[in-house]
Structures are given as structure tokens and as C-alpha cells.
């Protein structure tokens, strides 16, 4: 058994109009509480000593980094999972930004934000 989760990065992209959709969470705490419920509802089927991965990146808002990946990592740790690895997946050009590096660089400089080129893959072991 191996569970892979790739949740929305909070409200960066809206996936639906459903109020239960994680991407429609109004606050960071609401998002994390809801993600915690997803962990509980999913990993209850995962047997002891099996593994789970969470693929997620961070968010940039109000001129600061919101370490969403590490907040989500903590949701697993609070539930007794062991953190076995943190992998950093680097990516250069995504399909949505292909051949548009110049405009994104300009937007980042003029609007005071950072262009992320990575996301995390957290590997956990269920021990309870």
C-alpha cells in the first residue's frame, strides 16, 4: 500500500464551486483543518508500517511566503506519522508558463513576489 496525495495549494487555483473543496477554504486554518480531515479519511485505510506521500508547494501572498508545504507536513506529524523524507522537486518551465519567462519575471519584479520553481514531496510512514 502507498497513498499519494496532491492537494490544492489552498486557494491559488479554484477547482470547483463546491464548499467542501479544499481550494475554496476561506482561511489558512480552515484549509489545514479540512486537509487534516482528508488525511484522516484517507489514511484510515492505510495499514500500519505502510507509506504515504504528500506533494505540495508553498504560496506567496501579501509580499511573503506562506510555507503551505510545511504546514501540511505538520498535519501528518500531529497524527503520529513519521517523516521519512523531504524531496524537493525542481521544475523550470511549466505548461502554463511556457515561453513566458520574461513576462513572469517582469510581473514578479513589479509586483514584489517570488516565482516558485519547486514543490515538496513529503514521505511519511504510518506507525499507529
Q: Model-predicted segments: where are they?
A:
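Class I S-adenosyl-L-methionine-dependent methyltransferase catalytic core
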Residues: 1-128
